[in-house]
Each structure stands twice: as structure tokens, then as C-alpha cells.
Amino acid sequence: YRALNEQVMRMRQGTPLVFEIGGNESLHFCHHDVMMEAAGTSLQIHLQVPYRHITAAFNHAIRISAPMVALCANAPYLFGKDLWAESRIPLFEQAINVNQLSHRLGEGRVSFGTGYTRENLLDLFQENRDHYPIMLPICQPGDPQQLTNLMLHNGTIWRWNRPLVSLDTSGKPQLRIEHRVASAGPTLEDIIANTVFFSGVIMGMLTQ
């Protein structure tokens, strides 16, 4: 987080982060580091499906994002203000706002993305490469096939539905979907129910 904070403030040329959230009440304040994002605790659901279904599953995750927010909303208050039903969404989107994307995309590093994926999830990694400046300029040593630098760069782009690359125990790359829209808690039962709902809807849609 120290490195992330340094780079965000560098990309902002030292200007403070400005937060403006309007809801039932309004909140306006400035902050001089990225740690406001720590107030946006979420339930991050990771789903891995066979590769032949990964693109369809990703698009389905986008489709059910609004119902998931409606189902899981659990963060109406911030600093004593009654804002959105899920106030962590605007909070997180503004907590790492560097305004460095091309005009074509028009999205920040925390966003809903640019729409459905037409061919495969490679489209999203090409967007990462072509339209998002490197935030953590750290060249990781080792075998390029370990995809360390790709994973590091992807980890600094926080789509609400994000493709993730990792290596399995045999060193083979694998893809999974990280669904980030759900709020944390408030109870273990809620977390389990929300996770099962998301996974069940996706798997059900894949069988249609």
C-alpha cells in the first residue's frame, strides 16, 4: 500500500483525492492518501469454471451485478452521513482516482468496465496493456511464463468484475472471475447466502 499510495499521488501530481458522494445526505471531503479504500470492505467472490465457459460466465457476472448490489447492499453510512444504499461503491471509485485513461475508454481504474466481452477475456488484458499506465513499475524477476508482471498490473485495475490469472499447483495458468460488487457481511450466514446465490445463478445461466 505504501508503493500504491506513492504512485497514485505521483500520477495525481500531489493533488489530494476529492470525495463527493450525494445520496439522502451529501458528503464532501479531501484526503491525502489512498487509505480511504480500506473503508470499502467487500465480499470478493472468486468463481472458476471450465475455460470454454469463462467468457459467458464473465458476461453473466456483469448481467447480475445490479441484482447482487440490491441483494447485498449493506453500507449506507459513511462518517455519519446517510448516502447510497451501498456507499462503498462511490467511495472506492474515488479512492484511487488518477484520471489517466484515454478518452476512448472514459473509465477510471475502479469501474464497471467497458461492457461485455465479445471474444474472450484476452480483450480485457489487452485493455490493461493499451489503456492503463503502469501503476507499480516493478519488474519482477523470473520466468516470463510465470506471468508475474501481468498479474501485478492486472491487480492495479479494479473492475467490479475482474478476470484473474494464477498458476495451479503444476504451474499451468488458469483463469477465474472475481466478483467485487457484494458488500461484506453483516453475518457469516449472509456471506454464505450471497456467495451461493451468485455462484448458483451463474452456473444456472451457463446451462441455459
Where are these regions (language model features)?
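Phosphate/nucleotide-binding catalytic core
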Residues: Y1-Q208
